[in-house]
From Swiss-Prot:
Record carries keyword RNA-binding: no
Keyword annotations: Cytoplasm, Lipid biosynthesis, Lipid metabolism, Phospholipid biosynthesis, Phospholipid metabolism, Transferase
Protein name: Phosphate acyltransferase
Gene Ontology MF: a single term: phosphate:acyl-[acyl carrier protein] acyltransferase activity
Pfam families: FA_synthesis
Keyword S-adenosyl-L-methionine applies: no
Lineage, highest ranks first: Bacteria, Pseudomonadati, Pseudomonadota, Alphaproteobacteria, Caulobacterales
HAMAP family referenced in this protein's UniProt entry, alphabetically: PlsX (MF_00019)
Length: 360
């Protein structure tokens, strides 16, 4: 495949496999000319779907494999028996430089384990992080980590801040994102030692984003900052809580607006406004969670995503592949190292001054 940008796709991942993946590709192509696809999985099933979407068929190469990773498969099992599966082959295509990014709607734990095994961690980075794109009052906030690491020390939280800011810049277009550390209060003395230490490091270092300081849980929905950084345990609990609340309110609104003739009339009158609200809160608009920190781009689509949602994940992967976000991460890691060296040596120069000099 000779085109410059190729996306490798696990066509068997998710709850619906090719029946969602292929229509998702067809939708994504409307806004992504010049992108081609490697589709890994059951060749017959993929070809049957491609026959319904000639545009997607014209830019896709099918690579048949007999195995697929189950949605309930444990990461250890996936690594033992995963070689030759659609997920494994999709990630491996990135390592072999056949594709610039991989998208899968498969098992999150298995995808993380296989991706780490095949691609390895990027230089100078300790841990990967999973990103969530969070609809807010002001647009979209990037939240990480939302499940890759149960615990994170100060240096890892700082790395998440650097990776999250680079991602937000690449995908959401903010030239200089604002970053906050999730905490139980905004005062310097609040929170765990790891969070306070990360706060001190970020405050003292000049990076390609603006560090806001501590933020609280309600600041996520307010959109107080562009990027919210936390450990994977806290981030995952926050994400699942928000998803549950969204379903609750959606069901309550639907139940209330169909509770009687007057309520139904009110719903009809407000249908335009309700449609706008539904669009704003539609999770498919913000689907696509990259596994940051790897030597390659891997984007996780929600397993239950529809074609719109899968198209969104493809757009995230494409935006990352076309950006210089990895160079931005490397640049900020060098500034961080320079700041630490300046503080340790006590040479009397400001940390921001030294760090800035490294990047010039």
């Amino acid at each position: 495949m000779s085109q410059s940008l190729v996306i490798s796709v696990d066509a068997m991942g998710g709850d619906h496999g090719p029946s969602i993946v292929v229509p998702g590709i067809a939708q994504a192509l409307q806004a992504l000319p010049g992108v081609r696809f490697l589709l890994h999985g059951d060749g017959a099933a993929i070809e049957a779907e491609l026959a319904k979407h000639p545009g997607a068929k014209a830019v896709s190469e099918v690579r048949h494999c007999d195995k697929a990773i189950g949605m309930d498969e444990k990461p250890a099992q996936a690594m033992r028996r995963g070689k030759g599966s659609s997920m494994w082959n999709a990630v491996e295509a990135v390592r072999e430089n056949e594709a610039q990014a991989c998208v899968s709607a498969g098992n999150t734990g298995a995808l993380m384990a296989i991706s780490k095994l095949i691609l390895r961690m990027g230089a100078e980075l300790e841990r990967p992080a999973i990103v969530a794109n969070w609809p807010t009052m002001k647009g979209v906030t990037t939240v990480l980590d939302v499940g890759a690491n149960v615990e994170s020390d100060a240096s890892q939280l700082v790395e998440f801040a650097i990776m999250g800011a680079a991602f937000h810049h690449a995908v959401h277009g903010s030239k200089r994102p604002t970053v906050g550390l999730l905490n139980v209060g905004s005062e310097d003395q609040k929170g765990h030692e790891e969070v306070r230490e990360a706060h001190a490091i970020l405050r003292e270092t000049t990076l390609d984003f603006d560090y806001h300081g501590f933020v609280e849980g309600n600041d996520i929905a307010y959109g107080t900052v562009d990027v919210v950084v936390t450990d994977g345990f806290t981030g995952n609990v926050a994400l699942k809580t928000a998803e549950g609340l969204a379903r609750f309110f959606s069901n309550e609104i639907k139940s209330t607006l169909t509770s009687g003739p007057l309520a139904m009339l009110g719903a009809l009158i407000a249908s335009g406004a309700l449609k706008k609200m539904r669009h704003r809160l539609d999770p498919s608009r913000v689907n696509g969670a990259p596994l940051l920190g790897l030597n390659g781009i891997v984007v996780k689509s929600h397993g239950g995503a529809d074609a719109n949602g899968f198209a969104s994940a493809i757009r995230v992967a494409t935006n990352l592949a076309r950006s210089d976000f990895r160079a931005e991460i490397d640049r900020n890691l060098k500034r961080l190292t320079a700041t630490a060296a300046a503080i340790k040596s006590g040479d009397g120069q400001g940390p921001g001054e030294d760090a800035q000099g490294v990047a010039e």
